[in-house]
Curated annotation (Swiss-Prot):
Keyword field: Cell membrane, Lipid biosynthesis, Lipid metabolism, Magnesium, Membrane, Phospholipid biosynthesis, Phospholipid metabolism, Transferase, Transmembrane, Transmembrane helix
Gene behind the chain: carS
Main location class: membrane
Pfam families per UniProt: CarS-like
Full protein name: CDP-archaeol synthase
Functional note: Catalyzes the formation of CDP-2,3-bis-(O-geranylgeranyl)-sn-glycerol (CDP-archaeol) from 2,3-bis-(O-geranylgeranyl)-sn-glycerol 1-phosphate (DGGGP) and CTP. This reaction is the third ether-bond-formation step in the biosynthesis of archaeal membrane lipids.
Domain of life of the source: Archaea
Source species of the chain: Pyrococcus horikoshii (strain ATCC 700860 / DSM 12428 / JCM 9974 / NBRC 100139 / OT-3)
Gene Ontology CC annotation, any one: plasma membrane
A molecular function GO annotation: CDP-2,3-bis-(O-geranylgeranyl)-sn-glycerol synthase activity
Pathway per the UniProt entry: Membrane lipid metabolism; glycerophospholipid metabolism
Enzyme Commission code(s) on record: 2.7.7.67
């Protein structure tokens, strides 16, 4: 795989990365599950998933796509496609993260507890699925993202921890 293909894969997924990380800074407030519990007596999602974080991530990810369009318009072809793709990547990311939290609560994993694989790939796979109708990337680029995303995820978590945005470095 050529370097420009690796950069293109990274460029493609950038709105998802921003949507996934921005709730750490923008979140707080009312939990998406409103404090309700599932049939197993555990919270549906937990306090870490809030409406402010969800919509903040959606907005930030979409804005990243708009900025990308103005930096490299030929990649998207139109502003409308850039907005649609960034929105779907961001929405998929956030929905994938919610699904991951739901699964973690069912497994009785506490908030913030690392779930290797689920935390790193759940949002990525959901983002790629949501964006599929608008724009896809070659299989090699998807595989590259599956390899690089855990490294970026862990690095971003350590950075957020050192900045005081997260209580734990994972």
């Amino acid at each position: 795989m050529k370097m420009n293909q690796l950069l293109e894969a990274f460029w493609y997924i950038l709105p998802a990365y921003f949507a996934n990380s921005s709730p750490v800074v923008l979140g707080g407030g009312t939990p998406i599950d409103f404090g309700k519990k599932w049939r197993d007596g555990r919270r549906i999602l937990g306090d870490g998933k809030t409406w402010r974080g969800f919509f903040g991530g959606l907005i930030v990810g979409t804005i990243i796509g708009i900025v990308q369009y103005f930096l490299l318009p030929e990649y998207y072809g139109s502003l409308g496609i850039a907005i649609e793709l960034a929105f779907l990547l961001s929405l998929g990311t956030l929905v994938g993260d919610l699904i991951g939290s739901f699964i973690k609560r069912r497994l009785n994993m506490p908030r913030g507890y690392p779930a290797v694989g689920l935390d790193q790939w759940g949002f990525l796979i959901a983002a790629l699925c949501f964006a599929y109708p608008v724009k896809t990337i070659p299989t090699g680029e998807v595989l590259f993202l599956l390899v690089i995303t855990p490294l970026i995820h862990w690095g971003a978590n350590i950075f957020a921890y050192k900045m005081g945005w997260k209580k734990v470095p994972w």
